[in-house]
């Protein structure tokens, strides 16, 4: 017999392997997969919900991958995840992700969090700007 997601959350909320408690922080963090905010809360939990959403960097470090869990195959772990790659460029990829989530009406409450996580992943893949003397050498000028 399947239990509700609320009951599952009440059971695991204070004690699970993904919980990360820090000193002087009221709300504990979470390291569980498909948790967009990395916060231990019912809304973002990737364990208790039938439909979850995760955004991870793509395998080749160009773009990101959206990992969706199908509610239909909740009892079949091998079949219940779908991975969608987004590599078209930052703005286009974010627009495609938004269209995917809004068009399919898949967890409307996670749309904004997914866009923020995808944007952070794309920002982390940008090369850092070179500053100082190294920048002058990169431009072809010699420092004086």
Curated annotation (Swiss-Prot):
GO biological process: cytoplasmic translation
Name of the protein described by the UniProt record: Large ribosomal subunit protein eL28
Key words of the record: Ribonucleoprotein, Ribosomal protein
GO molecular function: structural constituent of ribosome
Record's compositionally biased regions (Basic and acidic residues): 133-144
Origin species: Drosophila melanogaster (Fruit fly)
Region named Disordered: 122-144
This protein's record includes keyword Zinc: no
Record-level GO cellular component terms: cytosolic large ribosomal subunit; cytosolic ribosome
């Amino acid at each position: 017999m399947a239990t509700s997601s609320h009951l599952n959350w009440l059971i695991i909320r204070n004690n699970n392997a993904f919980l990360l408690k820090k000193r002087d922080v009221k709300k504990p963090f979470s390291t569980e997969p498909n948790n967009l905010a990395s916060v231990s809360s019912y809304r973002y939990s990737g364990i208790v919900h039938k439909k979850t959403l995760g955004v991870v960097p793509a395998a080749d470090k160009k773009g990101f991958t959206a990992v969706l869990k199908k509610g239909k195959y909740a009892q079949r772990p091998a079949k219940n995840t779908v991975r969608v790659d987004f590599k078209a460029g930052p703005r286009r990829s974010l627009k495609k992700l938004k269209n995917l989530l809004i068009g399919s009406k898949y967890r409307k409450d996670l749309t904004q969090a997914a866009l923020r996580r995808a944007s952070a992943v794309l920002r982390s893949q940008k090369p850092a700007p070179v500053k100082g003397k190294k920048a002058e050498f990169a431009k072809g000028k010699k420092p004086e």
